[in-house]
Amino acid sequence: LAAGTSLAAVWGMDLARLGPALAQPLRPADVPTTLQQTIRQRSVGNINYRTLATAPGEPYVPRLDLLGKAADPARTARRRSLVYLGHMTDIHIMDAQSPARLEPLSAQSPSTWAGSIRPQDTLTTNVQAQMVAAMNAAAFSPVTGAPMAAVFNTGDSADQHSTLELRWYIDVLDGQSLTPNSGAAGQYEGPQVWEEATYAWHPEDPAGDWFGAYGFPTIPGMLTAAVSQTVESEGLAVPWYAVYGNHDTLYYGAFEIGESLRALALGDRKPALYPAL
């Protein structure tokens, strides 16, 4: 009421006219969401390296089976937005060079330990920065036009209960710059450059690893760039709130962290092959 009175005074408007105008439903915003465009698999099959392509958007589908009757066509003109929120979850920011990452477990059982190493591990902060930009671009609801009030991040922000991973994720959401490197400056130190670690994708030359046989590309300089770059984030434009996930408090999201694991995480050696574990 106070805000409406102030606006009326500033604009020289009759409060009796301004009130009803403010109470009118907002118009849907033209923002980039999956209503406009989606991402689909371009390549055929699920065995080899897969590429992606843009695809048409997906419209809202009224659940008339739940409603039990036809929807009122005039409902779109009467909509009110209780609140418009952004949602992120399972970001899994990774310190890909941490001695506590047990990548060789993948060689023992690729299915059981699928999360121990993935080709994109060094790029998680880049992905999160782009998620922030996409969230900011959707500042107004595509359904009602209501402004975004806040963003909720529902857990698994850090992948391994790591203070560094937690710091990086907070910095990206807050709009701080960072260099995602916990080792020697400008140098990636990990299984993706170790020749004996055939369980990992080697972007410099994947011919000798498991991924090369499935068509994974050669990308020279990728790892050096990943740990040398400064990741710039514009930061979320609205307040954000987070809750705990299992990866935020447990090792690999499953195991209690004891003294031996803590010593491994803070040590200066990193296992390359499964027998070393």
Each model region followed by its residue ranges:
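Acidic, histidine-bearing metal-coordination/catalytic regions of metal-dependent phosphoesterases
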Residues: 2-150, 158-243, 249-277
